[in-house]
């Protein structure tokens, strides 16, 4: 479903979608229904937003940490304050782009932005804080997997779960 908007994001997305289409339908000769295609492209968009979210979160964290360390506002808790600020602002970033490009409102659908934003924060808090902490404990303490590998394994569970929570709960349209 190509868009006819001329903004840079739409142009980049059309290129990505053409590459996906070529690989899946031409090279692998997969038969994909329109509904499957829409869900797949939505998941890829969600992944792109998530990748940008990770970069934004890290940059905000580092900047906040440097500001706190330079001004010695909260010396022993500086990294926690920086993490909270990074979480709040990066989820807001994700909300904006997910609302604009990934989980767009259907025709004649209604969606409360405030409720959607609160649900977005809750889903990211659940997967990003609660679930990842439990899974990390399981991988590291119970299964003795490296602390460096555990977060990567977490992504295999938390990203699809977060996608489902956002698609069917946070960004669900009222008809």
Describe these PLM feature segments:
Residues 105-124:
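Juxtamembrane helix-capping/reentrant segments at transmembrane boundaries
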Residues 93-103:
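Membrane-water interface of transmembrane alpha-helices
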Residues 1-40, 174-175:
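Transit-peptide-like, low-complexity N-terminal presequences
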Residues 98, 128, 137-140, 153-171:
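A structural feature that tracks compact, well-ordered secondary-structure segments
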Residues 33, 37-41, 74-89, 145-154:
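Membrane-interface starts of transmembrane alpha-helices
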Residues 48-53, 119-128:
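Select subsegments of transmembrane alpha-helices in polytopic membrane proteins
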């Amino acid at each position: 479903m190509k868009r006819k908007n001329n903004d840079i994001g739409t142009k980049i997305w059309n290129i990505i979608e053409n590459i996906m289409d070529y690989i899946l339908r031409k090279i692998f000769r997969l038969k994909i229904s329109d509904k499957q295609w829409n869900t797949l492209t939505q998941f890829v968009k969600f992944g792109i937003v998530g990748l940008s979210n990770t970069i934004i979160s890290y940059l905000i964290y580092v900047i906040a940490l440097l500001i706190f360390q330079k001004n010695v506002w909260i010396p022993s808790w500086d990294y926690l304050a920086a993490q909270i600020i990074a979480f709040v602002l990066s989820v807001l970033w994700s909300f904006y782009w997910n609302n604009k490009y990934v989980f767009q409102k259907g025709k004649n659908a209604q969606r409360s932005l405030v409720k959607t934003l609160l649900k977005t924060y809750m889903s990211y808090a659940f997967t990003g804080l609660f679930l990842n902490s439990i899974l990390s404990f399981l991988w590291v303490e119970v299964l003795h997997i490296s602390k460096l590998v555990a977060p990567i394994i977490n992504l295999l569970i938390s990203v699809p779960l977060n996608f489902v929570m956002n698609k069917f709960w946070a960004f669900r349209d009222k008809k």
